[in-house]
Amino acid sequence: LALFDRYGELKFVYAKVHTCDFDVERNLTPGENFYVTTLDTPCGKIKTGAMICYDREFPESARILMLKGAELILVPNACPMEINRLSQLRARAFENMLAVATCNYPETVPDCNGNSSVFDGVAYLPDESGSRDTCILQAGEEEGIYIAKLDLDQLREYREHETFGNTYRHPKKYKLLTESKIDEPFIRSDYRE
């Protein structure tokens, strides 16, 4: 993924960290890092990161991007976007208090079904009782250009006061997450680092 700003400047090149170990993708070399850059948009500057398709299956991908300062994660995708995958994207936005924008191939592409989406990550508003739907755009199965209005001020205000994200983490207690040992039932003969 090559991310360019609106002036044509290359901001970063990202290679998918979590490659699938089947089909043609098993021949790819996984990326080594996640990147965040500041994009100067007509609506203001926004810290933007990216992950690709299968990266969304791993909560650590979005968490690393949040820790690097991302307010928005862009996710190009090429698979069926069904309720569980949409729920993953919703969860990544919610737990990291950031926006997640996904674009997917339309239903005319094999194994894809459109359903591009944007989740703004703002679960509560001070003037509303209860939680709110963080989905601000859900496209259909057809090809198209879709525009979502992301309220950056609302997102930033929310991040300053809510308890999710990085506020109450206990990183010292998560050592097991950085170990590379794989135990049953998760051992696969085609696994590679």
Where is each model-derived feature located?
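Active-site catalytic loop in hydrolytic enzyme cores
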Residues: 1-68, 76-77, 81-91, 112
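Phenylalanine-focused residue identity feature
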Residues: 4-7, 12, 22, 34, ...
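C-terminal beta-strand edge segments of enzyme domains
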Residues: 106-193
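CN hydrolase (nitrilase-like) catalytic-core segments centered on the catalytic cysteine
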Residues: 56-146
